[in-house]
């Protein structure tokens, strides 16, 4: 594997990592479905395992999106290990802030993603993701609000 191929692969995988977070936050079905191989597995410990693009959409539409009014993921500490020219293992941390539908309150979730990425016919996608939640903490009495909700404009 050339240095250039390694750098291009790393950039493509970093985009996949971000695309998953953006797709869930912005509720973008097309983006979410496009990042998984048909035989991929996405496991969220305590929830279940979902297979392929259809499984990812099932998880989003029937579990994740109904749970939140809105959410935002912050992905960090992504570390990639090249197993071969076409297979990479990754680990990264995620912090999610969101407003739950149930109880209409805010929540903080910290999780670790352990991933496997594969390149097939020149394209990188997820072949496996395992999400392990470290913290699932409702923030009692707090509801995240957009700017302008709590403060009147100057001179009002």
From Swiss-Prot:
Instruction: State how changing residue 50 to A affects the protein, per the record.
Output: 62% of wild-type activity
Q: What is the effect of changing residue 73 to Q?
A: Loss of activity
Q: Does the keyword Lyase apply?
A: yes
Impact when changing residue 20 to M: 69% of wild-type activity
InterPro entries per the UniProt record, alphabetical? NTF2-like_dom_sf (IPR032710), SnoaL-like (IPR037401)
- Give, from the UniProt record, the effect of changing residue 144 to L: No change in activity
Which residue ranges traverse the bilayer? none
What class does this enzyme belong to in the EC scheme? lyase
From the Swiss-Prot or TrEMBL record, what is one GO molecular function term? lyase activity
Active site, per annotation: 25, 73 (proton acceptor)
Q: What is the effect of changing residue 115 to N?
A: 73% of wild-type activity
Provide the E.C. number(s) assigned to this enzyme: 4.5.1.-
Top-rank taxon, per record: Bacteria
Q: Which Pfam families match?
A: SnoaL_4
User: Which keywords does this Swiss-Prot/TrEMBL entry list?
Assistant: Detoxification, Lyase, Periplasm
Q: What is its main location?
A: periplasm
Q: What induces it?
A: Constitutively expressed.
Give the UniProt family note: Belongs to the HCH dehydrochlorinase family.
Miscellaneous note, as given in the UniProt record, is: Is not N-terminally processed during export, so it may be secreted into the periplasmic space via a hitherto unknown mechanism.
**Function recorded in the entry:** Catalyzes the conversion of the important environmental pollutant gamma-hexachlorocyclohexane (gamma-HCH or lindane) to 1,3,4,6-tetrachloro-1,4-cyclohexadiene (1,4-TCDN) via gamma-pentachlorocyclohexene (gamma-PCCH), proceeding by two successive 1,2-anti conformationally dependent dehydrochlorinations. Also shows activity with alpha- and delta-HCH, giving alpha- and delta-PCCH respectively, but not with the beta isomer. Is involved in the degradation pathway that allows S.japonicum UT26 to grow on gamma-HCH as the sole source of carbon and energy.
Name of the molecule in the record: Gamma-hexachlorocyclohexane dehydrochlorinase
Q: Which organism is it from?
A: Sphingobium indicum (strain DSM 16413 / CCM 7287 / MTCC 6362 / UT26 / NBRC 101211 / UT26S) (Sphingobium japonicum)
What gene codes for this chain? linA
């Amino acid at each position: 594997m050339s240095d250039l191929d390694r750098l291009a692969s790393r950039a493509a995988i970093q985009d996949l990592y971000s695309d998953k977070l953006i797709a869930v936050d912005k509720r973008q079905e097309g983006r979410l479905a496009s990042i998984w191989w048909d035989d991929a597995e996405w496991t969220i410990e305590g929830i279940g395992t979902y297979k392929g693009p259809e499984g990812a959409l099932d998880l989003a539409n029937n579990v994740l999106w109904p749970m939140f009014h809105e959410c935002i993921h912050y992905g960090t500490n992504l570390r990639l290990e090249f197993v071969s020219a076409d297979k990479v293992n990754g680990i990264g941390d995620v912090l999610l802030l969101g407003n739950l539908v149930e109880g209409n309150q805010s929540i903080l979730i910290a999780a670790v993603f352990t991933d496997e990425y594969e390149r097939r016919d020149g394209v990188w996608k997820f072949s496996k993701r395992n999400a392990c939640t470290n913290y699932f903490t409702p923030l009692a009495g707090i509801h995240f609000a957009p700017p302008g909700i709590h403060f009147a404009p100057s001179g009002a």
